[in-house]
Regions:
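Generic structural signal for well-ordered, non-transmembrane alpha-helical segments
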Residues: 24-31, 122-126, 152
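Short helix-capping and hinge/turn segments at secondary-structure transitions, especially at repeat
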Residues: 28-35, 39-42, 60-64, 84-94, ...
């Protein structure tokens, strides 16, 4: 996805100036997430808690409509659903840090699963979903401001999630986040 977006970017010309202004930040975040997940895959042992489950590709406000949509269902690690739900809470103004802490504390993941969860939280799927809609002309470019205006808050949210997971298992530090 990151490579494809870089390819598309060359063809933007001056059509998507606002999108282009923030693309480097989100591509960098995506590269961080990919590296974090690749490192977890290479260094951590999986156990029976890491089996594939039926997951949602995305969780959003239309969950009731997409719950049984086969195009929104994938086989993946359970951390996918958890990370999508945590992102949903943040971006839909339903964020309560006590609820997030309770969710994380209720998880029984392996170390690999927790690293995967945090790597997925780092990956800016929320940005790329809007990006695709803008490129496909189903959303206006100004929609990206909803994400951009929350960059600092989302970084604080990531720090909080990192700290909560670290109460259960020590994660490798993401330097720019500390």
């Amino acid at each position: 996805k990151v490579d494809y977006i870089n390819y598309q970017r060359v063809h933007f010309n001056k059509e998507y100036l606002l999108l282009d202004d923030y693309l480097d930040y989100f591509l960098g975040l995506a590269e961080n997430a990919i590296s974090y997940i690749q490192d977890a895959t290479a260094k951590e042992k999986k156990d029976e808690r890491d089996e594939l489950v039926i997951s949602h590709r995305r969780i959003n406000s239309n969950l009731k409509k997409i719950y049984y949509n086969v195009e929104n269902i994938v086989l993946d690690h359970i951390s996918r659903d958890v990370s999508e739900y945590l992102k949903y809470l943040f971006f839909n103004e339903e964020l309560d840090y006590n609820t997030v802490a309770n969710i994380i504390n209720s998880l029984n993941f392996s170390r690999y699963g927790y690293r995967l969860l945090f790597g997925r939280m780092l990956f800016p799927s929320h940005f790329f979903d809007i990006y695709e809609n803008i490129i496909n002309n189903s959303q206006k470019e100004l929609e990206i401001k909803k994400i951009v205006l929350k960059i600092c808050d989302y970084e604080s949210y990531l720090k909080f999630i990192f700290q909560e997971i670290n109460k259960k298992t020590k994660l490798p530090i993401v330097e720019w986040l500390t």
